[in-house]
């Protein structure tokens, strides 16, 4: 019954707004005009306010609060920078305009022409000389209210239901300024990384999203069909193999901010559609790339937050270089006491069983080690830690280690208990690369549907010759979570994937 009353109230409010819309139109007022000339935004106007000068301004925004007092009214508008108070007097705007103002609601978008002044309470405001309705809102927005309870500020009627916030992100952005702040920081993070890379002379490129063969990661793809060519295509799971082709083609450094797609589970760290930036630099190796990551992450955190410190999942985390380095074998030994070096697949499977892990019998040695690491080590690595020198089975695209047989030159950066980025000294020997991909193909035949496939065109490119190269992939969504302190990937993606309503 309570839900029905709430719905009835919403219907009544919407009907009243539809009636107001009709009344405005009957009065010759277009509730949806084409444009309005804005001369300044709220933050800019407040920052440049001068006590001894009445500056003429034209501002626009959404009405977020109204206080009517007979022949005068105060209301707040919200624009992309913040909020600003508007003062409106009936005697100055005229009877007709003030009557129109009475038809406006919270949520309507207006433009105001006037001059700046400071109220008796000290608030910098705009004294309206005229206003114009720019958009009549037909659906009421949820507006949080505040009151003091025993000396503490209490917020109620807030738009706080998480799933509803994700489904109606447009409303979330209107009423929750901290959400807007997170996405502004996300944009700043991407901009800083892009500037960092381009300042080195590296080229930003674009590679195919629809691919005839998927590769570059161990993951299940989304499939689609090209009608004209009558062929199956895949949404990319990574852009690695195409970027390496560009290194073969003669570029010394390339990077791409890419939407990648993996047909896998959804949780607070995984979304089927996510953003990565991948970077490939010729004549460098994974040790050089570790130093670059340290510099990049420290600079990015400072650029966005003003400090290299961040708080994530209740932990104070420092992104100040240098980061700890630990081989994957040493990390498993440190956190479980188990030894993985030199172990056969059967021995690793028994080891995992002794540790209490239930494993899919179809996976091989690399996946077993990955499961052990993911269960017992990764969640405990809170401060940024480079995990290095992985077994060959775990990294079919990485170069053999120069001094440790059976291992490859690879690192993952773990921070806050999750992988943030992944890097190799890239394998450029086409003979070894073919062997590795054929081994992956045999794992697929055993039933491992995340194993890679043999990409003959990529192998052909390597046969022309690729210089020594360092590669890096950074999960942008997770990096944003780390720097902003958000605890779910859904809070850093504007429109995360959800089950149907």
Swiss-Prot record:
What's any GO biological process attached to this entry?
lysyl-tRNA aminoacylation
**One Gene Ontology term, aspect cellular component:** cytosol
Molecular-function GO terms, alphabetical: ATP binding; lysine-tRNA ligase activity; magnesium ion binding; tRNA binding
Q: Which cofactor does it need?
A: Mg(2+)
Can you tell me which residues bind Mg(2+) 2?
A: 419
Question: Where is this protein chiefly located?
Answer: cytoplasm
The places in or outside the cell where this protein is found are: Cytoplasm
Arranged from A to Z, the UniProt key words for this protein are: Aminoacyl-tRNA synthetase, ATP-binding, Cytoplasm, Ligase, Magnesium, Metal-binding, Nucleotide-binding, Protein biosynthesis
- What PANTHER family has UniProt attached to this entry? LYSINE--TRNA LIGASE, CHLOROPLASTIC_MITOCHONDRIAL, LYSYL-TRNA SYNTHETASE
Assembly and interaction partners: Homodimer.
Q: Which HAMAP family match?
A: Lys_tRNA_synth_class2
Name this protein carries in UniProt: Lysine--tRNA ligase
Q: Which organism is it from?
A: Chlorobium luteolum (strain DSM 273 / BCRC 81028 / 2530) (Pelodictyon luteolum)
Gene name of the record: lysS
């Amino acid at each position: 019954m309570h839900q029905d009353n709430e719905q009835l109230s919403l219907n009544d409010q919407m009907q009243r707004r539809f009636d107001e819309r009709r009344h405005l139109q009957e009065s010759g007022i277009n509730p949806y005009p084409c444009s309005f000339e804005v001369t300044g935004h709220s933050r800019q106007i407040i920052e440049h306010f001068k006590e001894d000068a009445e500056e003429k301004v034209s501002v626009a925004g959404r009405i977020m609060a109204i206080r009517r007092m007979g022949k005068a009214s105060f209301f707040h508008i919200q624009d992309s920078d913040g909020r600003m108070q508007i003062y409106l007097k009936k005697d100055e705007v005229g009877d007709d305009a003030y009557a129109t103002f009475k038809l406006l609601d919270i949520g309507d978008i207006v433009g105001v022409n006037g001059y700046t002044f400071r109220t008796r309470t000290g608030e910098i405001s705009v004294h309206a000389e005229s206003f114009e309705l720019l958009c009549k809102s037909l659906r009421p927005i949820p507006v949080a209210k505040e009151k003091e309870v025993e000396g503490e500020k209490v917020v109620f009627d807030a738009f706080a239901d998480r799933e509803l916030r994700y489904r109606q992100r447009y409303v979330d952005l209107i009423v929750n300024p901290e959400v807007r702040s997170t996405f502004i920081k996300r944009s700043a993070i991407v901009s800083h990384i892009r500037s960092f890379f381009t300042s080195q002379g590296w080229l930003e490129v674009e590679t195919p999203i629809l691919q005839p063969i998927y590769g570059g990661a161990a993951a299940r793809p989304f499939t689609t069909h090209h009608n004209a060519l009558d062929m199956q295509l895949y949404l990319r799971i990574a852009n690695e193999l195409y970027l390496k082709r560009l290194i073969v083609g003669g570029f010394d450094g390339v990077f791409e901010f890419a939407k990648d797609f993996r047909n896998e589970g959804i949780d607070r760290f995984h979304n089927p559609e996510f953003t990565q930036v991948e970077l490939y630099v010729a004549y460098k190796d994974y040790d050089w790339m570790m130093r670059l990551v340290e510099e990049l992450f420290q600079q990015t955190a400072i650029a966005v937050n003003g400090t290299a410190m961040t708080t994530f999942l209740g932990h104070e985390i420092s992104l100040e270089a240098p980061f700890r380095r630990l081989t994957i074998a040493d990390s498993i030994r440190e956190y479980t006491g188990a030894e993985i070096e030199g172990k056969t697949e059967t021995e690793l499977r028994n080891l995992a069983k002794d540790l209490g892990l239930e494993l899919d019998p179809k996976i091989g040695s690399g996946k077993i080690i990955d499961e052990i690491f993911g269960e017992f080590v990764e969640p405990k690595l809170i401060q940024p830690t480079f995990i290095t020198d992985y077994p060959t089975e775990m990294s079919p695209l990485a170069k053999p280690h120069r001094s440790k047989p059976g291992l490859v030159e690879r690192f993952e950066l773990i921070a806050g208990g999750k992988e943030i980025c992944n890097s190799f000294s890239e394998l450029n020997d086409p003979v070894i690369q073919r062997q590795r991909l054929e081994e992956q193909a045999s794992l697929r035949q055993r039933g491992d549907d995340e194993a890679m496939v043999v990409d003959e065109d990529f192998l052909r490119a390597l046969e022309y010759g690729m210089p020594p190269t360092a590669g890096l992939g950074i999960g942008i969504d997770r990096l944003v979570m780390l720097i902003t302190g958000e605890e779910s990937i859904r809070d850093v993606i504007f429109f995360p994937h959800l089950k149907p309503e």
